[in-house]
Amino acid sequence: MERTLDRVGVFAATHAAVAACDPLQARALVLQLPGLNRNKDVPGIVGLLREFLPVRGLPCGWGFVEAAAAMRDIGFFLGSLKRHGHEPAEVVPGLEPVLLDLARATNLPPRETLLHVTVWNPTAADAQRSYTGLPDEAHLLESVRISMAALEAAIALTVELFDVSLRSPEFAQRCDELEAYLQKMVESIVYAYRFISPQVFYDELRPFYEPIRVGGQSYLGPGAVEMPLFVLEHVLWGSQSDDQTYREFKETYLPYVLPAYRAVYARFSGEPALIDRALDEARAVGTRDEHVRAGLTALERVFKVLLRFRAPHLKLAERAYEVGQSGPEIGSGGYAPSMLGELLTLTYAARSRVRAALDES
C-alpha cells in the first residue's frame, strides 16, 4: 500500500504544481467569468480576457508548469465565448498566436483540455476557475480529480507489468496493485452519480464544451473521455484490435493526453497487448501451474473493476443525453454515448478470453 501511495503521490504533486501556479496573475479576473456568462455579456468576457492576455509573447523564463497554468486561465474564456456563439480567435485580437505559443510550450492542443479544467485547477473556493460557478460543475471537476492521479499510476504499472512473467508471483501482486488504482475510477463514477444532475449537465455545463477553431483546425472541448484510460486499455488489451471504430476512437483523443502517454500508445500500437502476452504464456506453460492460475485470476479481477466503471459510465452518459429536449446528441468529445457501449462490449470480450483460459484447466 505504501508503494501505491508513493506512486500516486508523484502524479498528484505534478497536478498540484500547475494548480498552484498563477503566472498571469489572473485569479481574481477569472473568478468574475461565471457572472459574465450568466449575463451572456460577450463584450465583458472579451474585455476581461484582454486584461491579462500576454499578447507581447510568453515570458522567456516560462516552463511547462507556467504555460499549462496560463492555458488553464485563458481556456475558460474560450469555452465561454463559444458557448455564446463566437469563435474565440475571431473576436479576441491577438488571441490565436498566444494559444499556438502555449500549445508549443506544452505539446498539447491550443485550448483548454480536461487536464486544465480539473487537476490543474485549484480546488479552493476562492481560487477554483469555473465556467458557471454552479455546484454541479464543481462536483464534475472533483469526480475527475478523484481518479486522475491513480489512473496515471495505473498506466505506469500496466507498462511495467507487460514485462513481468505470468509464472512469477509478482504478476499477481502487480495485478492486485493495478486493481486498487482502478478502483478510484469506480469511486469517481459513483461520486458523479450522487452529485451531478443530468439535467444541469446537459443544459448548463455541456454547452461550454463545444469545439473551437485555432490555426485553421478544430479542437474538441474538454470532456471526461479525454482521461487516458484508453491508453491503459490499449496496453492491457486493445493494441492489436481490428475494430476500426475503436481505433478511430483512440486516435481521436491522442492529441489531448500528455506526450508521455502518446509515446506509450505508439510503443504498443500493432504489438501484442499485455493480455495477448499473458495468454500466450499460459498456453505454453499450462494453466495448472499455481502461479499461472494466480496470475490469470488476478488479471481477471482487473477486468472486473474496469467493467464496474464502464457499465455505470455508460448509464450515466445515457441519462445525461436522455434529459436533453434539444441540442447535441453527442458528447463534447464528438461521440454518442453508444460508443461507451461499444467499449463495454470490447472489455467484456477481453475478460472472456481470460476466463476461457482459466476454464481450460
UniProtKB/Swiss-Prot annotation:
Domain of life where this protein originates: Bacteria
Cofactor(s) recorded in Swiss-Prot or TrEMBL: heme b
One biological process term in Gene Ontology: L-tryptophan catabolic process to kynurenine
Catalytic activity: 7-chloro-L-tryptophan + AH2 + O2 = monodechloroaminopyrrolnitrin + A + CO2 + 2 H2O
SUPFAM superfamilies, A to Z: Indolic compounds 2,3-dioxygenase-like
Enzyme Commission code: 1.14.19.-
Any Pfam family: PrnB
Listed pathway(s): Antibiotic biosynthesis
Binding site for heme: 313
Record-listed substrate binding positions: 222-225, 321, 332
InterPro entries in alphabetical order: PrnB, Trp/Indoleamine_2_3_dOase-like
Any GO molecular function: metal ion binding
Role noted for this protein: Involved in the biosynthesis of the antifungal antibiotic pyrrolnitrin. Catalyzes the ring rearrangement and decarboxylation to convert 7-chloro-L-tryptophan (7-CLT) to monodechloroaminopyrrolnitrin (MDA). It can also use 7-chloro-D-tryptophan, but 7-chloro-L-tryptophan is the preferred natural enantiomer.
Subunit structure: Monomer.
Entry protein name: Monodechloroaminopyrrolnitrin synthase PrnB
Provenance organism: Pseudomonas fluorescens
